[in-house]
Regions:
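Membrane-interface helix caps and helix-loop-helix hairpins in membrane proteins
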Residues: 100-111, 160-163
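Membrane-helix boundary connector in multi-pass membrane proteins
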Residues: 104-109, 125-139
Length: 163
């Protein structure tokens, strides 16, 4: 008979949660990579557009923080309505995160992607709100993500405007 300790359950929750965030990021990255050398390279971009090599390390850190934050909420609040609500919002924003790459890079639709990223920002803000009720450090872990997505929203708007 195998006994799973409390520490092992916690570690498993963290690994699964971070892996889920990276899975969404990996799928989004697959869509993105194909568009970078062709369609995206031809777009007019604003002066504040970062170089392409910046995006992968930033997103790697953000997906790690997102997954870790979600695991903290899962472990502390999965049996409480606030915890469940927080995780529903988190799941929705994770789907919109992946959807943005599909719409922007896969479908080449900056305007449609702008709509998606605005909804994404709202869902991140709501996730932070609910995470804070369950685990304040988990909410703080999402602030860099909200900041980056806010910047990406401005970048998306500028690309739409310039093209």
């Amino acid at each position: 008979m195998m006994i799973i300790t409390h520490k092992k359950k916690n570690a498993l929750a963290v690994v699964v949660s971070i892996s889920l965030a990276f899975a969404i990021g990996g799928l989004a990255g697959q869509v993105t990579q194909g568009a970078i050398p062709g369609w995206y390279a031809q777009l007019n971009k604003p002066f504040f557009n970062p170089p392409n090599y910046i995006f992968a390390p930033v997103w790697t850190l953000l997906y790690f923080l997102m997954g870790w934050a979600a695991a903290r909420v899962w472990l502390k609040g999965r049996h409480h309505k606030w915890g469940k609500t927080a995780l529903y919002h988190y799941g929705a924003q994770l789907l919109f995160n992946g959807l943005w790459s599909l719409v922007f890079f896969g479908l080449h639709q900056p305007l449609g992607a702008l709509v998606v990223i605005i909804i994404l920002g709202i869902l991140i803000e709501r996730s932070i709100y609910w995470f804070r009720l369950v685990d304040r450090p988990a909410a703080y872990m999402l602030y860099p993500y909200l900041g980056w997505v806010s910047f990406a929203t401005l970048l998306n708007l500028a690309i739409f405007w310039l093209n």
